[in-house]
């Protein structure tokens, strides 16, 4: 097994009542990028839990069994908190259910037609991606959310810490209970990375159009440069992303 970090479920509370629309340093792109992630988290977390639960009874190692239970607790709490923030986005004019309808359809079709082993492998890949984002959130004293609204900064930092804590649980279950396999692991990470960028990019652009910012190239260029420039918040995470392959 690869997991040695203690997984500690927490139940924090965040006051999201006064979160502004552009809560991350007043930057529309920086804000909506993380909004586009958040809006998918509740359904994504439930997908991850079910994918691991499919193999839970095949795990015999006591430490991993305990890690699985704490993984479930952490992921369930993530879903609850991001549902709360999604309600804030709804009140600010984002039609949450409409935005995530295709994502929900993708999950239903995947669970119906794909093998349980590949669903677990996809979960391990997505967990790697979210853990990399979590490590990025903590990098440089929290530079990713340095000037964010305090409650949003606390929410994403808490989520990031827990993603790092349980980052290898799905992978350990995949290796010990599902038989592992390099090819499917590598392909799942590649497909998962492309899927995350496609889905998040599409929703990000949809939100920016709702904000009527598609006609403000300087605002958009500044925000995307902060994410994907040579030292962008996402660009600098690429080396960490490749470790899983």
Model-inferred region functions:
Residues 8-21, 90-112, 126-134, 184-198:
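Carboxylate-rich helix-loop segments that flank metal/cofactor sites and access channels
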Residues 18-40, 101-126, 143-148, 194-204:
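Acidic/His metal-coordination segments adjacent to aromatic residues that form catalytic metal sites
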Residues 129-132, 141-180:
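Hydrophobic, aromatic-enriched interface-forming segments
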Residues 31-40, 62-77, 115-123, 148-162, ...:
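Alpha-helical scaffold segments that form or flank carboxylate-/histidine-based iron centers
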Residues 2-8, 72-99, 166-174:
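Conserved alpha-helical segments that form or flank metal/cofactor-binding pockets of metalloenzymes
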Residues 24-58, 74-77, 81, 117-143:
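Alpha-helical bundle segments that constitute or directly flank the non-heme di-iron/ferroxidase center
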Residues 243-245:
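Conserved small/polar residues in nucleotide/adenosyl-binding loops
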